[in-house]
Structure formats: C-alpha cells, structure tokens
Amino acid sequence: AASDVYKRQEFDYFKYAGNDARFNVPIDKTHQYYNPVLTGFYPDPSLCRVGDTYYLVNSSFTFFPGVPLSTSKDLVNWTPAGHVLDRTSQVPLKGQQVSAGIFAPAISYNKKNKTFYMITTNVGAGNFFVKSKDPSKGWSEPIYLKKIDGIDPSFFFDDNGKGYIVHNGPVVGGADYEGQRAIRCFEFDVKGDSIKGDFKEILRGGTHVEARPIWIEGPHLFKKGKFYYLMCAEGGTGGWHSEVILRAKNPMGPWEECPNNPILTQRTGLDPNRKDPVSSAGHADIVEDGKGNWWAVFLACRPYEEDMYNTGRDTYLLPVTWKNGWPEILAKNTPISTVGEKAGLKPAGKNEFSGNFSYVDNFDAADNGIGLKDLNQRWMFLRDFTDCYKVENGKLNMQLLPGNIYKREPMSAIWARQQHGTFSAETEINFTPRNDKEIAGLALLQKEDHNFVLGKTMKNGKLMITLTRAEKNNVTIASAPIKGGKLKLKVEGHDRYYDFYYAEEGGDWQLLAKGVDASNLSTQKSGGFIGACIGLYASSNKE
C-alpha cells in the first residue's frame, strides 16, 4: 500500500505537435537544413569535435538533470546523449529561482590526456568543472574553482598541453558605467585540476571601447595557424546581442580587434517588418570539421512581436568564412534565413530537434531514454530531484506534493520544452481531488510568477476545471463544472495567444478559454533566461 501515494494522479500520455509557418518550406535534407538546429529552450551552445563526432551542450538553469548533451556527425542532425550533470551531488539547485542555476556551460576536449571537460557556473554554488573520458559513461563530481569571480568560464587546451580558462568578470578597479565587464584569463594546471597563480584582465569593456560596450561575456579561446582567437558575446542577450573577435600571438594577449566586428548580429540594418525574423543572435562557439571547414553555433530567438518570444533562445548553425586571417559568421545587415546549406548531410530517422515535428509519449519502454528515471530525455525536473512519480504499465503516476509552481520548493511536475510558436500539447489525466486545494493537469512555466495552470480541482466540494494565469498575480480566468472520470486537457498556442480545451470521458473537446494573452510566458515580460516549458503537474497545495 506504500506505493498508493503514487496512484493519486495518473497521466496516460503526452502529445506535442509544432507547426510553425516558417518551417513549412520543403527542403532537400541531403544538403539543406532548418535553423534553428536545436529548437526551443537550448541557449548558450558550446561544442567540440572528437574524431568524427561533435558534442554540444546548452544551459539548463534550474532544471535537472543539468546541461543537456547532444551528439552529431554533421552538425545538423543531433541526437540526445543524456545530461552532463545527472546526479544531484553535481548540481545543487535547492531554493534557486527558475533562471538561476546553471549558466552557459562550455565543453572542451584535451587531446593530450584524452579527456572531456565541461565547465560552468552554478549561480547558487560557484564555478566548477566536471570531466569524463567517455561522456556516455557519465562525468566526475564537480571540482570547484573558487578563484573565478564571474560567469561563463571556458577551457582552452593548447597544442603543447597547456591549459587556460577565460571567463567574464568584474572590471579591475570598478566599472566606469553600467554593463561594463571584463574578460579574465587564468593558466590552468592540467595535472592538478587547479588554477595557477592570478588572473590577467585580457579584455576590458569589449571592442570599440569608445562606444562603451556592455556585457562582454561568453568568451572562447581557440587557435588557428599562428594566431590565438578570443571570441566573445557583446551587447547583452537581447536585441543588441552580437559576437566579436580578437586575435593575438599569445593566449594572454596583447589582443588585436577584428576590423570587421561584430562578426555576427541581427541588431541593425534589417527591416523590422521582415518575414520570419530572427533576433538576439550571439553567444557563439566555433569548430573546424577536420577538413578545413569552420562552423559556428550560437543562440538566437524567433520573436512574434518586437522582443517577445515564448520559445526561449534556440541553437543556430552557420558556416564561417575566413578572410585575411579573420572569421565572419554572417555578413553585415544580413537576416538569418530559416534554411541553411550544408553538403553531405545524413538525416537518419525522425528529428525532434529541428523544423516542425510531433511526438507522442506513451510512457512505455520505447519512450524511456537517458534522462530522468524511466522517462524520455525530453523531460526535466525543476530544481533538486524529488522522487514524486512512478512509470507503470504505460502510465505516469504522480503523488501530490505540497509544493506548487509558485514557490521555489520541490513539486510534483515534469517539464518539456515549448519548441514552436504554433503548437499543441495535450494529455489525459485520471485524478479525483479530495479537497479544494488539490489540483492536477497541464502547466505552462516561464517563472514562479509567470505561468499557467490548466487543472482539475474542486470548488466548494464540486469538481471543476480551472485555468489560472500568473503575471505577478495569480488570476483564475476561466472555469467550468465537470463530471467525474478521466479528463483530457489541451493547449493550442498561436504565438502570443493560446486557446485552452478540455474533454470529459467519452466526450468531445470543449473550449474553456480562447485567445488568452500568453505573453506572460515571454522573457520580455518575466525577466529571466529560459524558454517556456509545458508540465505535467500535480499539487496538494498544503500549507
């Protein structure tokens, strides 16, 4: 009878479909691809190549497991490969707000000791790295680097085996203006897994310092020919975002600015009314394919109006061209196109990362991948993992924890990304609330105080379906009486406006609320850094 707490709420399936107009352009998948290559909340991409395989990581903030890892043979067709931080001991997240946690991971491979390194910042615990000889077999416990004051650390391993860490930090002597930051460089003792000596401030403020640049961050060091290159994001991860580059004969500088900076941006020189706009491009990483071709991955967004997007920051791919010893990711005043060209692509099976796609998760063995116990990798937990569910006989059974979506505490919910502006998500629940506080159903999350809950509950002892919208304050905007039995729930998104439906057992879909303003799920409204997530959610709401 002990497992009966898991029987309180049952989800039968989860169905998702994305249908954005911009991806309804037919392509030849042997030499064309859709941007973004990782759709939805996959920000701050970093990658490395080992042999013929590319390894890519993204930020995960307070979701667990942390730092999704994807692999590819061609940079376009990506396969989920687990998470770097899959044990709570590696990534303490307790009590952190949604957009804290893990910022901007960077992945590197040291050829000398044949070891992968992933270094990142946990806002609540400090800067650290983990390492692995074989990512498919897991990663080490965290090694914290207390000397790093700042965010966005990244490793560089030179041909001679020497190690370096670059990161964003405060300006030595204090900032002269808001947003002024610096890039620092440390030498790294590879054998001792520790930082050597003190840092050097290698870039102060950014490029074109006379223009008072802001938020220089996301630095990566790499080498080509006789030059070392320092590539950074600049302008902040919004509409003014960009990528800039400098070069030097030594990883500690002195640095020469590229005369063509920024080498990637969507901030100026573009028609604001252009079709299928892409915004906020920056935070890039760069890789060579082993045949002399260079490619960049970076984050950008698909706004539905001005600076609003619910899908978060996606991962894009573009070729890099070299001229006079400098790389360029995108020519000035060029809009990022939805379709990219790359020869020799090998699409295999179904791509649930790029373009329009749909999936049904039946919570059966076929769905269970490498991720949370007995669940497909698409599912994430928020903050420290709580053993609140069991997958049995093709059902997801969930107990009702007292925590809820509005608080920074453990709750019964698993989350998948909203990957399209035009989408639908549905589930069927089998749940009987015992009082007016208990609720279970579908949730849409951007932040603790920016979300929706579409759920089955009770009001004055009568069964109800309710829709609650949070934008700072929680407001129940629609409700309807329902009978007992199973209940289907569905949300259909149309960029800014969402429609919410329900269907009683054996009955047709009923519209509960139409054209609801869902801009509360945008970072523009909420502040923060994640893309909206769709949750299977249950709470007892006990005080």
PLM-predicted stretches and their roles:
Residues 1-6:
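Short, small-residue-biased leader/transition segments that mark boundaries at the very start
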Residues 7-48, 76-108, 120, 138-157, ...:
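Surface loop/turn signatures of beta-propeller and other carbohydrate-active proteins
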Residues 7-26, 60, 326-327, 331-543:
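Extracellular glycan-recognition regions
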Residues 37, 43, 48-63, 102-123, ...:
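Hydrophobic core segments of beta-strands in well-ordered, beta-rich domains
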Residues 49, 69-74, 129-134, 246-250, ...:
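Short beta-strand segments and strand-loop junctions that repeat across beta-rich extracellular domains
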Residues 65-67, 125-127, 181-183, 241-243, ...:
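Repetitive beta-architecture junctions, highlighting loop-to-beta-strand starts
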Residues 70-75, 131-137, 186-195, 245-256, ...:
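Short loop/turn segments immediately following beta-strands, especially the blade-tip
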Residues 268-318, 323:
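Repeat-solenoid scaffold signature
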